[in-house]
Each structure stands twice: as C-alpha cells, then as structure tokens.
Amino acid sequence: MRTHLRALTAVTTVTAVAALAACSAETTDDAAEPSQDSAAATIEGPVISYNSPTEWANWGAVLEAFTAETGIEAPSDPKNSGQSIAALEAEAAAPVADTAYYGVVFGYQASDKGLVQAYEPEGVDEVPDALKDPDGEWFAVHQGAIAFLVNTDELGDLPVPTTWEDLTDPMYEGMVGYLDPTQAAVGYSVLTAANLALGGDLDDFGPGLEWAAKMKANGVVNPVQTATASVQQGEIPILIDADFNGHTLTAAGDPIEVVYPEDGSLAIPYVMSLVADAPHEEAGKAFLDYVLSDEAQALFAESYLKPIRDVEVDPQIAEVFPDDYDSLVATPDFAQMQQVQEDVMARYQAEILG
C-alpha cells in the first residue's frame, strides 16, 4: 500500500473551488463553455441516499462537501443496510431514493431483486473486480476488516493474542467476544474469517465451526448487537469486530490495540448503487461520481475505513493499516459467501448453539 502524505483538506478545498468557480463565472464571456460546477448546478436535486447517517463513516462531512462542490442538496438518511433494502422493495413502484449504501451482501440482494440499475461512475475502473458488480449495479466505496480489538488495561500481564488459535487458549477464558453470527452480519464475517484462516473454504466450514466450538468451551461471549462499548469499558477485554471501530477508540484515547490476526483476516466492503427509476437520477449519478473522488475517499478515511482507491490521506490515518494489509485481508467470493450463509447458520445453530 502506498502512503501519501497530504493533510485531509477536502471540505476546505472543494468550498474554495466552488467559490473560485463562482467568481470566474461573473467575468466569463456568455459564450464560454460552462464549468463542471455550473453544469452540476443545472442538475435537479436533491439526491436522496439511503443509509447515510451523519455519524457513520464520516457521511456528514461527505454530504456537506458534495453539496459545497455541486450545489445539490444531499440530506443524510438514518437507515441501516437491511432497512434500506426493505424500503427500496416497498417503494419499488414509486422510488424515493436515488442511491443506496450497504454491506456487500446487500448489494447482491439489491441486484437480485431488481432494485438497482447499472451505472459505472468515474474512478470505478480502480475498484478491484471482486468488489464491484460485473454489470455495474454496485461497487465498493471503502472497506473495513475483521480484527481483534484488545483492551490492554483489562488484559493485564497476559500476552496480546495474534492468531485465531490463540483465542482458544484457556488463559483467555471468558475474555473474548464476537457478535452472534446468526444475528449479525459482522458475526458471520468473523466466523468466515476464522474458517478461511484455519484452512477451510466457502465449501467447507468445518475448521471454522470447530474453532467456534472451542471458543464456546472457553466461555466466549456472543452479543446480538454492536458491542464496541463493551470492549471500551472492559466488559469484553477482547472483541473480534470491524477494525475501524477499534481504530476510532484508539484515536479517542482508549487503551485499545487493534490486532490483524497473523493467520488471516477478512474484508468487510461497503458498496453503493444507483436506484432503479431514481427520481433524481442525474443527481444520483453525480453523487456516485463524487464518492469515488479523491476528496470523498479521503473523508471516508477519517473514520478509519480503508479507501477503495489509492488516494492521499492523512499520514496518521494511513499508518494504522499494516504494511501487509493486502496479504492479510482475504477478499472471498462474496456471492458464494451469501449463497452458503443459510446452510452454515443452520449448522452453527445445531452444532454450536444447540
């Protein structure tokens, strides 16, 4: 991974560009070709993007910067991935949203249900093939990865675990947690990551289920909902979760060490789509172009989500990702991961939860 050394100044930059463009417009001959900002101003808005809560993934700053650059209003939306899919289905006859954002598995669902349409924004050629739909109906905008979030204060003199097998050691009895895979998408990603790291594949979840059985015997905690506060407060000293949640806690001064397991992790991509029959389709396209821009990618990185494109970010943010990130973090066939999920969860229910 290349590390670029430029401060994150996207909001200031785009605002300045917009201001300069406005000043230039006052002195430009009427016959001159309109600027990109002027062209954007002719696009009818607003753009409604489902699942863009202000405090998540730095969406608040991204939406604000997009409006500053284009003049197109872009209100935030509080839905999560599942709620977004449900709303798109309910509104299919008269769509309300123009774009939608969700975990990659939901991208497959949206495509399969005919809820989205093809659009390939500027910069999509830099998105890895495994992280975009071949027909252009969704593409990744950034990703997280599975990691061990370790509260080092609560760990005391115990060594920090670095592999999946380490977590099954009796010295960590009752100290490890991960979200219930039958209830949470991140939990299923944890199980899949462990399975792949321990020699399994998407056709064989045996190693992952054996690991889960050992974890159960070692007193693992399986919350149903987000448990970041539990590791922050020391209730769960070692939480297996999304890396960006840990980096955020560390940046806030909490005693959290983020460990990418030496034997392998798993990518957690987040993708976007243009909604089928979007009421403000051109505004939606402009927004999708923007989320892959250097400015937006750098803004997403402020929440410790790894940009999907190789862009310049604050060096203090870039340095939290290990140099061997790309080799540690597996990118499986997410379509197959979705297809086998029901059967794997049935086995987990029977063999682990019993």
Label each residue range with its predicted role.
Residues C23-I43:
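Short, low-complexity, disordered segments immediately C-terminal to signal peptides
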Residues G144, G174-Q183, L209-K214, V220, A252-A276, Y290-V313, ...:
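Periplasmic-binding protein-like
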Residues S38-E44, I48, S52-E73:
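Short, polar/charged alpha-helical segment
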Residues V105-S111, Q232, P237-P255:
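A ligand-binding cleft/hinge motif common to bilobed small-molecule-binding domains
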Residues I48-G60, K79-Q83, P95-E235:
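Extracytoplasmic ligand-binding site segments that recognize negatively charged/polar headgroups
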Residues A18-A22:
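C-terminal motif of bacterial Sec signal peptides marking the signal peptidase cleavage site
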Residues A147-E154, T192-A197, I268-E281, V291, ...:
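A bilobed periplasmic-binding-protein/Venus flytrap-type ligand-binding module shared by bacterial periplasmic
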